[in-house]
Swiss-Prot record:
Primary localization: cytoplasm
Reactions catalysed, as given in the entry: 2 D-alanine + ATP = D-alanyl-D-alanine + ADP + phosphate + H(+)
Identification of the protein by name: D-alanine--D-alanine ligase
ATP-binding as UniProt keyword: yes
Family under the similarity heading: Belongs to the D-alanine--D-alanine ligase family.
Transmembrane segments: none
NCBIfam families, per database record: D_ala_D_alaTIGR (TIGR01205), PRK01966.1-3 (NF002527), PRK01966.1-4 (NF002528)
Gene3D superfamilies reported in the protein's UniProt record: 3.40.50.20, ATP-grasp fold, A domain (3.30.1490.20), ATP-grasp fold, B domain (3.30.470.20)
Pathway assigned to this chain's UniProt record: Cell wall biogenesis; peptidoglycan biosynthesis
InterPro entries: ATP-grasp, ATP_grasp_subdomain_1, D-Ala_lig_Van_CS, D_ala_D_ala, Dala_Dala_lig_C, Dala_Dala_lig_N, PreATP-grasp_dom_sf
Record-listed Mg(2+) 2 binding positions: E297, N299
Domain ATP-grasp: 124-330
Binding-site residues for ATP, renumbered to this chain: 154-209
Amino acid sequence: MSKINLLLLCGGGSAEHDISLLSANYFETSLAKSEQFNVLRVVLDKFGQYQTAAGDDCELTNNREIRFRDETKAPWPVDYVIPCIHGYPGETGDIQSYFNLIQLPYFGCESEASSNCFNKITAKMWFSALGIPNTPYIFLNQYDDEAIAQTQAALENWGSIFVKAASQGSSVGCYKVDDSSKVAGVLKDAFGYAPYVIVEKTIKARELEVAVYEYQGEVVATLPGEIICDSNTFYTFDEKYAKSSKARTDVVAQNVPTDISEQIRAYAIKAFKGMKLRHLSRIDFFLTQDNEILLNEINTFPGSTPISMFPKMLQNHGHDFTEYLSLVINGQLAAK
């Protein structure tokens, strides 16, 4: 049986470029445990240029092969690609559209599902349409006096708000606001990251995460895990990834009533199926002191760094990551 030529594409053009390289390390290590795959790791830089781990400049062609700038090297045919890219152009759905165009099978959610989840406004509209509770919000499409006034009114009404760039990941362009004097400046900063901004009511709640993935034809939702930050903080980019982070994670959240845990998992599966996600996702919830469940966001290519929850929750659920990848990839290629 011939090996599968698997392109592990990582990097990308977002603020999460370096994080995706860490996630790619985990994928590379997991894939190396199987004898089925020839893996070529290629980094997509912030300017759209491709380079192998060995430093060879290259490109992915419409003929589904890696072509090297050094023409003495033979092109490398690609059977399958894992776009391990957090943020643009991976989780935004852009690169999946290209894969679809050249008919290259790939791991993860398809283009439309990725785009719908990455845009926080679109995602919340989907959550509501599916009947899944989520945080109160308003959205803004330009930075002007009216936007400032609407945000001031939201702050007065809700007491505390989050101002978020609508199309960024990992808490990039996300600001907690309690002081009305900071509204204008924060809005300006948020619009610097995206053309649309969402303003959400601050929810005092536990932050729970569920790994949701396809396994042998079934959609699996793990028990909720939990992110625990210092009091009066939220899970910022630095809290997620900095070595000095004081946040901690529990692979299985403690003291969550069984019926609440099951409802969270049911909502997670409903969101996965309803938004037509594929292969994997991490779905994040708030759980208030009154046991109110609110869907926060969906990550269509969750991190797989040493501190990331998705691989830990999958393993805790009894599934091996290498076996999981092999099942998905082989099943997809067999269906071609």
